[in-house]
Amino acid sequence: MEGGSSSSNGTSYLLAFGENNSGGLCPMTMMPLVTSHHAGHHPINPSNNNNVNTNCLFIPNCSNSTGTPSIMLHNNHNNNKTDDDDNNNNTGLGYYFMESDHHHHHHGNNNNNGSSSSSSSSAVKAKIMAHPHYHRLLAAYVNCQKVGAPPEVVARLEEACASAATMAGGDAAAGSSCIGEDPALDQFMEAYCEMLTKYEQELSKPLKEAMLFLQRIECQFKNLTISSSDFASNEGGDRNGSSEEDVDLHNMIDPQAEDRDLKGQLLRKYSGYLGSLKQEFMKKRKKGKLPKEARQQLLEWWNRHYKWPYPSESQKLALAESTGLDQKQINNWFINQRKRHWKPSEDMQFVVMDPSHPHYYMDNVLGNPFPMDLSHPML
């Protein structure tokens, strides 16, 4: 892979991880340099019409034979410039790193370009590796490469970064610098560290959003797989709710557990609450939406006592116990049923008004002296 600026007055840097023939990782990141007016008074020899790659920076430069991954900072600068172009355009920040070469371009010839470029690259490489922000720059670049990478690739990146930092620290220990000695180099390191940090943030943002979206979808699919049988198997014997004191260590939620185990732990811990909520929900059902079994029992009683469908209080208690309903629901059901489906006959209307039949009075609590399963001969 290669990169660089195709214009005559542009300077760009190419960051690469690993050597192509060393088995390392080789993603490339192309970034423009921040412009600076430093060293703008050094023109390049107009007689040199060849494009010369004046600066190759390796951070650090590991030999290919070792197979150790390395990080390379490559500056491809086009030197095909005239005196007018050099006077009319600002010089890029990377131009500072060729300052030691410019005198060779003024007074040398093409045979000296290779050696001067090599010496300049070594000098700039040493300056960058000795700068206090070098480890920050190295870590920022590796963090960009780690975004979205699988775990094994992340491990290799961290290993290579640590190896490169250790090697660079050993090579630059003798010539370490401090902030303020070289303002242009300080600006270069600060600008690229900030640029790489922002680049990592921009890369991470869509990845995090995608991961959150997938987690929500996965959670929704898991909720759909919970069947009613799972709740029924965990409701028995614990309908009155569970307290935190009743939960032992075995029922504590383990965040590292598998999805299936986590589902079982949640059901065991909160089955009592779920049972209570289900009972409360059943009580708050809409009127007329009684359970099918309860309505069937009420209809059977209605058919047996159709001539006088007014259950006594004891019969209402018996119906409430057998159907699981409360007396208010039973009263409402009988009231609605009589309004819609029952009209007393003329004989029954006369009997209601006859004092000789007190057990048919609607307001008489003890009106029906017979058990629930027996009927009066007149009924």
Swiss-Prot record:
Disulfide topology: none
Any GO molecular function: DNA-binding transcription factor activity, RNA polymerase II-specific
Keywords in alphabetical order: Activator, DNA-binding, Homeobox, Nucleus, Transcription, Transcription regulation
InterPro entries: ELK_dom, HD, Homeobox_CS, Homeodomain-like_sf, KN_HD, KNOX1, KNOX2, TALE_homeobox
DNA-binding region coordinates: 282-345
Domain of life, per lineage: Eukaryota
SUPFAM superfamilies tied to this protein: Homeodomain-like
CDD domains linked: homeodomain
Low complexity: bias regions: 109-122
Main location class: nucleus
Entry annotated with the keyword Cell inner membrane: no
Protein role: Possible transcription activator involved in early embryonic development. Probably binds to the DNA sequence 5'-TGAC-3'.
Family: Belongs to the TALE/KNOX homeobox family.
Protein's recorded name: Homeobox protein SBH1
Natural source organism: Glycine max
